[in-house]
C-alpha cells in the first residue's frame, strides 16, 4: 500500500515474478469516473469512491472464492485503501454512508496476512507520476498527495487491524538498483 506513484504496482509485479506467485493489480483504468474526478472532484468523488469500493470487493472476493487460484498472492492494493481515499475525497455525510457499506462488505473478505506500506517523498511521488504519464494525473496537486499520505498514516496508527511494515523508498530505487530491491525483500522477510 501507499500513495499514488509510490511504486506499489512495480514492486508487486517484481515480487510476483521473482517468487512465482499471482499478482492482483488494482483495476483503476476501468473506473469510468477517475478522469472526471481529477477535472471535477466535488462532482465525481462519490461515484468514484463507490465504484472503487465495489470493484475492489468484487476483485478480492472473486479471487479468494475461486477454488482454482492460489491463496498466496501479492497485491498492489488492499481493501482498506477504499476507506483512506474516501475519507479524503468525500463529504462527512457521504463518508458515513460509505463507511457503513465498506463495513458490510469487509466482513465478507479475508484479511491480508501482512501489509507493506511504501513511503516516498512528495517531490519524488510527483516525479514518478510524471514519468508514468497518465494524462489525468499530470496536474495533481502536492497538497492532495500530502492529504493521502496523512490519511494512510492516520489509518495505520488508528484503524489498522493486521500487521504492517513501513518501508521508506526515498533512497531505495528498486527498479534501477538490484541491491535496493534485495534490501526491501530483507525488510519484508524479517517482518
Label every model-predicted segment.
Residues 28-31, 79-80, 120-125, 171-174:
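Conserved nucleotide-binding/hydrolysis micro-motifs of P-loop NTPases
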Residues 127-139, 143-191:
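NTP-dependent small-molecule kinase module
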Residues 83-153:
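A glycine- and Lys/Arg-enriched "phosphate-lid" helix/loop adjacent to the NTP-binding pocket
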Residues 17-55:
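Conserved substrate/cofactor phosphate-moiety recognition/catalytic segment
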Residues 48-110:
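Glycine-rich phosphate-binding loop used to anchor ATP phosphates in small-molecule kinases
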Residues 8:
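Conserved lysine of the Walker
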Residues 3:
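P-loop (Walker A) phosphate-binding loop of NTP-binding proteins
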Residues 11-12, 16:
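Post-Walker A alpha-helix
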Amino acid at each position: 500500500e501507499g500513495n499514488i506513484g509510490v511504486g506499489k504496482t512495480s514492486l508487486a509485479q517484481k515480487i510476483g515474478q521473482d517468487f512465482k506467485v499471482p499478482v492482483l493489480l488494482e483495476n483503476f483504468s476501468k473506473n469510468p469516473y477517475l478522469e472526471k474526478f481529477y477535472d471535477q472532484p466535488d462532482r465525481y468523488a462519490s461515484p468514484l469512491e463507490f465504484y472503487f469500493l465495489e470493484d475492489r470487493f468484487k476483485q478480492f472476493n472473486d479471487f479468494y472464492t475461486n477454488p482454482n487460484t492460489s491463496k498466496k498472492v501479492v497485491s498492489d492494493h488492499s481493501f482498506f485503501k477504499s476507506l483512506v481515499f474516501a475519507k479524503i475525497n468525500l463529504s462527512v455525510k457521504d463518508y458515513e454512508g460509505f463507511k457503513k457499506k465498506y463495513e458490510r462488505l469487509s466482513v465478507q473478505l479475508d484479511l491480508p496476512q501482512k501489509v507493506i506500506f511504501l513511503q516516498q517523498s512528495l517531490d519524488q511521488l510527483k516525479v514518478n507520476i510524471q514519468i508514468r504519464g497518465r494524462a489525468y494525473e499530470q496536474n495533481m496537486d502536492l497538497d492532495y498527495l500530502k492529504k493521502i499520505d496523512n490519511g494512510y498514516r492516520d489509518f495505520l496508527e488508528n484503524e489498522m487491524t493486521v500487521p504492517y511494515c513501513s518501508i521508506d523508498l526515498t533512497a531505495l530505487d528498486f527498479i534501477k538498483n538490484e541491491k535496493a530491491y534485495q534490501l526491501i525483500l530483507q525488510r519484508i522477510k524479517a517482518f
